[in-house]
């Protein structure tokens, strides 16, 4: 088989909508985090590849898993992550969970309700936060807030990309029961502008996601590592801003994203608040709820 590396989209950690191993994170952690990212990005690109059939995608994902577990040396991203984890004495559990999500991307194109979407997030998003916490030696008591934040980020992304996911991959993460309740049809996702019913569905899901992100807001204060706490505060601020935009905008007719200057302002505002909180030993900074 062709190396999975050759199927990469070309997207790197610098192209993501959120920080990945940014300058905020201590340099001693960056190599491992980037090894994890490159493995995950490779698997994600395979699952989303428009020219591969489903069986071939699953074969590649199985190959990445096998080599991550030590059975082979042909896939650079898997071998690099395996060695990086071994150096730190960490198991591959979070990467394996993410492979479960990518297999779901290949085999499951529709979701019946919110609970099914959250179940998907358990494998597609929550392992990323748990991995970062484990890398920094944080307690598993932080997982609850981390899971909420990561799931909120994932659903934000689902809403932002709902049109593209449907048109290019026939993949729909919007719960079927929510579409039905709003009177919307899956086919509406192929339009250049949301129908009133679809817009109602999307904005209602954004409101629900805002509540989920609220459950993640204590995370920065629960984290002991100073730098990771700052990074999480930035990610939370980014997620809150995006979900506010999704409550009032149409992701089919416009790209819902932060401009670079908006991201910089949000980042430094969040870091400043977190620095103040940590300097004075206070509890979580109270941010406005992410509502329109």
UniProtKB/Swiss-Prot annotation:
Highest rank taxon of the organism: Bacteria
Keyword list, A-Z: Lyase
Single Gene Ontology MF annotation: squalene synthase [NAD(P)H] activity
Pathway(s) per entry: Secondary metabolite biosynthesis; hopanoid biosynthesis
Single Gene Ontology BP annotation: terpenoid biosynthetic process
Reaction catalysed by this enzyme: presqualene diphosphate + H2O = hydroxysqualene + diphosphate
EC category: lyase
Pfam (any one): SQS_PSY
This enzyme's EC code(s): 4.2.3.156
Record bears the keyword Cell cycle: no
Record's function text: Involved in the biosynthesis of the hopanoid precursor squalene (SQ) from farnesyl diphosphate (FPP). Catalyzes the second step, the conversion of presqualene diphosphate (PSPP) to hydroxysqualene (HSQ).
Matches recorded under NCBIfam families: HpnC
Name of the protein: Hydroxysqualene synthase
Gene field: hpnC
């Amino acid at each position: 088989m062709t190396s999975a590396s050759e199927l990469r989209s070309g997207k790197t950690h610098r192209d993501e909508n959120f920080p990945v191993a940014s300058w905020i994170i201590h340099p001693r952690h960056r190599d491992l985090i980037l090894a994890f990212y490159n493995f995950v990005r490779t698997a994600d690109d395979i699952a989303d590849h428009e020219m591969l059939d489903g069986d071939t995608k699953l074969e590649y994902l199985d190959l990445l898993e096998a080599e991550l577990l030590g059975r082979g040396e042909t896939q650079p991203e898997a071998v690099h992550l395996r060695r990086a984890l071994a150096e730190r004495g960490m198991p591959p559990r979070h990467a394996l969970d993410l492979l479960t999500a990518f297999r779901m991307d290949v085999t499951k194109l529709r979701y019946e309700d919110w609970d099914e979407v959250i179940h998907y997030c358990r494998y597609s998003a929550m392992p990323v936060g748990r991995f970062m916490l484990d890398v920094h030696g944080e307690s598993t008591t932080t997982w609850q807030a981390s899971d909420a934040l990561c799931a909120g980020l994932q659903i934000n992304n689902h809403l932002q990309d709902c049109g593209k996911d449907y048109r290019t991959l026939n993949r729909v993460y919007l719960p079927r029961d929510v579409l039905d309740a709003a009177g919307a049809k899956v086919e509406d996702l192929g339009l250049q502008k949301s129908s009133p019913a679809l817009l109602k569905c999307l904005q209602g899901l954004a409101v629900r996601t805002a509540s989920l992100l609220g459950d993640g807001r204590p995370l920065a204060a629960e984290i002991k590592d100073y730098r990771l706490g700052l990074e999480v505060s930035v990610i939370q601020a980014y997620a809150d801003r995006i979900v506010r935009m999704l409550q009032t905008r149409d992701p089919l007719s416009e790209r819902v994203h932060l401009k670079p200057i908006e991201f910089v302002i949000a980042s430094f505002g969040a870091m400043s608040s977190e620095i103040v909180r940590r300097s004075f030993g206070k509890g979580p900074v109270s941010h406005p709820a992410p509502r329109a």
